[in-house]
Every structure is written in C-alpha cells, then in structure tokens.
Amino acid sequence: MAERYISQRHWSQLPPEEQIRVWEDYEAGRATTFLVEPERKRTKRRRGEHSTKPKCENPTWYRPARYKALSGQLGHAYNRLVKKDPVTGEQSLRMHMSRHPFYVQKRTFAGRKYAFRPEKQRLLDAVWPVLVSFSDAGTHTVGMSVSRLAKEISPKDSKGKVIPELEVTVSRLSRLLAEQVRFGVLGMSEETMWDRETRQRLPRYVWITPAGWQMLGVDMVKLHEQQQKRLRESEIRQQLIREGVLREDEDISVHAARKRWYLQRSQDALKHRRAKAAARKRANLLKKLPADQQIYEMSQHILKRMPPDEAYWCTPERLQQLAIRELYQLELTLAAPPPH
C-alpha cells in the first residue's frame, strides 16, 4: 500500500482533547514544536506507470478558405482570435484565450488552484476559433455536438479522416467544456435523455454566454441588435407562428429559441439512430440469405416504400438496380458466399 502524507497543522486547529494532549507532551519534553503531524493514512491508490500525455498535444484549427467569411460581431470576434499573413496567407493565433485575465480572476470560483497546464492551454486556444466559427448568430449555440467538435479539431490525413493516434478524444474535450461552463463563459444543454435503443445519450451542445463574448472583445450592444434581428428572421420563429404559438408581432426569446433548437436536434438524432438501427437489423437478416434472395427481399422492401405512381412505372430492371445499390449501402458483399 502507498502512504499518503498530509501537511502539518498548528495545535490550535486540533480538537480540545488533542490540544490538551499536545500541551501535556510539550510540558513533559516529549514534543519540541507546536506543529502537529497528523496520523499517516494508508490508501490503496497508486500512481500507474501509464503515460498521461494526450494523443494530440498541439491541436490547431483555422477556418478553411472555402468557408464564407463571418459577418457582424461574429466575424469581429474571429478576427480578434485569428490573424492571416497577407503575403503567405497562413493563419495563426492573434489572441491566446488561455492567457486571458478572466481565467485568473475566476479561478477559485471555478474550483481551480493553479493555472492551466500547457497541453490544456493549447487545446483551449484551438477550441475558441471553432466555437465562434460555428456559433449561430441568433441563439449563439454552437451547431456541433461535443463529439463532432472533437472530430473537427483532431488532425486528419490526406483523405480527410481523423488520425486515431493523434485524435482529440471526446472525453478530454468534454472535461474542458465542462470546466468552461464552471467559469461561466459557456453554457451547456440540460441533462440529455437516455436512448435505450443505442444505449447512448443524445448529443450535448454548448453556447457562448455574454461573459464569453465580453472576453472576445465584441461590442455587446451591436451583438445584441444582430442577435435580435436574426431571431426575428429565424426559421424557428416562423415555425412557431405557423403553429399558432406566436403572433406575427411577437418576438421569440433567446432561451425559447435555444430550447426549441435543441429539441429539433434531439429529434433528428433519434430519427437518424432509428434508421441506422433498422438498416443494421435488416442487413443482419439479409446476410443469412443467398445473393439472389438478398436482391429479391430488398426489391420487395423498396417497392413497399415507393409512392404508388412511381411503383406503377418502375420496371423490374430498375427495381433490381435500386436493390443492389441499397445492398451496397448496407455493406453487404454480394460476391461472398452466404454463411453456413
């Protein structure tokens, strides 16, 4: 077992019974100091031999050239974070958010004692350009889930796929964002629902709070005006008006728009997961059949989903082509023999 040592305490911090014992030892000459060493507590905790170094020590992310430039105060915030060399066109950080005095002022409030470690500083500097770049002008919600943000920041190969050895893990980014929520610069969606089908929780999203925008140095008055204008033009408000929840002259609040947006994202995630689970279940059933039987079963399935007018004019050759294409999408190799 490993031993855990606790710093010494002054005798005045001890309970009354122990204070009497300390003075008795001091008068008897058995104690020569007023600092009392507490009993050593034994624990089973051990420092492992594994490396705690993150996979991606120096993540970076800049807005690609093919992206449309951000407008208004969002563009101003991004330009304060990132600068572009006019000669070479290379982008680099103009402002390191990890060194902002706000993190020093609110350190105790967030439950920290010390400054950020270098690897966390670099991750925090890389996260903020992504948050600003994908933030909605109306709700200030980042349009990516935490797992999608981790994938976006992670280094990629020439084909655009994440390199597993250098990826930014979801757990690492999730801990960082949760700490930013404690600092008050980010907000996070409420506790997500549990999806029994996939045994996973629905995605979580974050948004930038007014404290976060103030750190970025934007004009809060202009930001609020642009936010209200975008909310009045938003699809969420038009949908509520069509449903009769809002009148034409009523405005939607930021909280209501954000809650409605998150509900839509949750429903989209559920639909996608249900469709994916149904496709996988169908693929597992078709794997047991011969190739010609797979095509026949898939053809019947496609025919049932077709509109009546389209199904009437669909030829057997066209239906077979659709079935083969659907089978390839289900990752079924028709050339392989069926399992026995």
From Swiss-Prot:
Q: Which UniProt keywords apply?
A: DNA replication, Plasmid
- Protein's UniProt keywords contain Ubl conjugation: no
- Gene behind this protein: repA1
Q: Show the taxonomic lineage.
A: Bacteria, Pseudomonadati, Pseudomonadota, Gammaproteobacteria, Enterobacterales
Q: Which domain of life is it from?
A: Bacteria
Note the Pfam families from the entry. Answer: IncFII_repA
Any one Gene Ontology BP term: DNA replication
**What is the organism field in this record?**
Escherichia coli
| Residue numbers spanned by region Disordered | 38-58
The name on file for this protein is Replication initiation protein
